[in-house]
């Protein structure tokens, strides 16, 4: 249903945010 869609979207967003954070850390090093 709608709730599982929201949860999936949140998971994808969290993954993307995590990757972006790792990239920023890698650039800073």
UniProtKB/Swiss-Prot annotation:
Keywords: Amidation, Amphibian defense peptide, Antibiotic, Antimicrobial, Cytolysis, Hemolysis, Secreted. InterPro entries: Dermaseptin_dom. One of its GO terms (cellular component) is extracellular region. It holds the Pfam family DD_K. It is found in: Secreted. The modification Valine amide is found at residue 29. Its main location: secreted. One of its GO terms (biological process) is defense response to bacterium. It comes from the Eukaryota. Expressed by the skin glands. Belongs to the frog skin active peptide (FSAP) family. Dermaseptin subfamily. Antimicrobial peptide, active against the Gram-positive bacterium S.aureus, the Gram-negative bacteria E.coli and P.aeruginosa, and the yeasts C.albicans and P.brasiliensis. Has hemolytic activity (40% hemolysis at 128 ug/ml). This is Dermaseptin-1.
């Amino acid at each position: 249903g709608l709730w599982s869609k929201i949860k999936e979207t949140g998971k994808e967003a969290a993954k993307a945010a995590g990757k972006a954070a790792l990239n920023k850390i890698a650039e800073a090093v």
